[in-house]
């Protein structure tokens, strides 16, 4: 049974109102990809979730046993969630599960609940609210808005003894210079 679920928003994306573009791993423009800053976050998340020293920045964090990200589809071709955590998966020698796409949050949660240990999920921020509400069983135990400008949070859900269910915690990542120390 899953004991901890950590959820991050995909890394920074291209800004429609500026000259910042999405780029693929080879540096070619791709609007469905991370921005250069998103790629920086992706790289920093490797040691955030797999610290070389074995010491996490918070006791609420743990090394993932399984990693899920929103898979690209015809309706949502974005590769941002995948590329945000691909490096983490590679560093831990884990398969990155891309089976579910945006809009399939219920199927994602159903599968995550069958996984043992610790799960990391990277997803689109508005749909993260749906994922957390499905896990918690209500919309009162967690924030119901994730600002468009925030890419620097981790939401952690820890399984509690029955009948308590889940404990919700938020953590700032504090990985890049502009990251906020404040949670929602």
Where are the predicted features?
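Short loop/turn segments immediately following the C-termini of beta-strands
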Residues: 124
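Active-site-proximal alpha-helix that buttresses catalytic centers in soluble enzyme cores
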Residues: 1-116, 127-184
């Amino acid at each position: 049974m899953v004991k901890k679920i950590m959820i991050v928003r995909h890394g920074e994306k291209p800004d429609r109102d500026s000259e910042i573009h999405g780029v693929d791993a080879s540096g070619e423009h791709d609007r469905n990809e991370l921005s250069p800053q998103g790629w920086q976050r992706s790289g920093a998340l490797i040691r955030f979730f797999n610290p070389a020293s074995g010491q996490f920045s918070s006791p609420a964090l743990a090394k993932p046993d399984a990693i899920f990200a929103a898979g690209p589809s015809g309706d949502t071709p974005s590769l941002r969630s995948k590329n945000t955590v691909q490096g983490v998966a590679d560093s831990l020698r884990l398969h990155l599960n891309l089976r579910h796409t945006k809009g399939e949050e219920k199927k994602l949660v159903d599968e995550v609940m069958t996984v043992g240990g610790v799960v990391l999920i990277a997803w689109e921020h508005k749909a993260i609210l749906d994922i957390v509400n499905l896990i918690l069983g209500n919309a009162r135990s967690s924030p119901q808005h994730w600002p468009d400008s925030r890419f620097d949070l981790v939401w952690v859900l820890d399984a509690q003894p029955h009948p308590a269910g889940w404990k919700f915690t938020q953590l700032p990542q504090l990985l890049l210079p502009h990251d906020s120390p404040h949670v929602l």
